[in-house]
């Protein structure tokens, strides 16, 4: 019976390791996301940065900043152990395409630098953000990535309603 239990534990450990994303895969995913997000910002006309498809929803620039700022907070708090994001976008420049693009690129640069420099113990370190239960840095990064993909997808109609074909998605494989 003990042998069966030990074998089951070993199989579970192997299955978990097989599912685990490597640090390089995380870096590759975040670099690809950076490319995709910057392509969306580049595609949207300057005149449409404040465009919103209906009243009461975020405009295009606000949508981008919403998830990009979250990515920055996750990197700063979960990877670097800071209390808050190390920089923000000047809100007076929110709807200036060049400023939005620069902020977005800077955030992804910060996140990627923090991720590339993270040790295995930093990736496993538990932290709590947004009054939610503590999670590992890797889990926070995955949740932030998912949030960014979801929110970027919401901007497709913003582009189309301004006569812009959304940029093609860069496949990971």
Where in the sequence are the language-model features?
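Bacterial N-terminal signal peptides that target proteins for export
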Residues: 1-8, 17
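Sec/Tat signal peptide C-region and signal peptidase I cleavage site
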Residues: 14-20
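Short, low-complexity N-terminal intrinsically disordered segments enriched in polar/charged residues
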Residues: 20-27
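Short, contiguous alpha-helical
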Residues: 27-31, 35-38, 48-89, 128-173
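Acidic/histidine-rich alpha-helical segments that form the ligand environment
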Residues: 93-128, 136-150
């Amino acid at each position: 019976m003990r042998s069966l239990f030990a074998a089951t534990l070993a199989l579970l450990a192997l299955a978990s390791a097989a599912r685990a994303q490597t640090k390089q895969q995380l870096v590759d995913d975040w670099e690809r996301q950076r490319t995709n997000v910057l392509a969306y910002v580049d595609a949207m006309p300057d005149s449409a940065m404040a465009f919103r498809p209906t009243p009461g929803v975020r405009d295009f620039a606000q949508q981008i900043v919403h998830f990009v700022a979250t990515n920055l907070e996750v990197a700063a708090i979960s990877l670097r152990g800071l209390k808050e994001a190390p920089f923000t976008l000047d809100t007076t420049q929110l709807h200036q395409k060049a400023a939005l693009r620069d902020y977005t690129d800077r955030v992804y640069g910060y996140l990627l630098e923090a991720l590339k420099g993270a040790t295995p113990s930093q990736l496993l370190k538990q932290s709590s953000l947004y009054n939610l239960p503590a999670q590992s840095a890797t889990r926070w990064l995955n949740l932030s990535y998912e949030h960014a993909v979801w929110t970027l997808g919401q901007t497709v109609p913003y582009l189309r309603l301004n006569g812009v074909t959304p940029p093609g998605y860069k496949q990971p494989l």
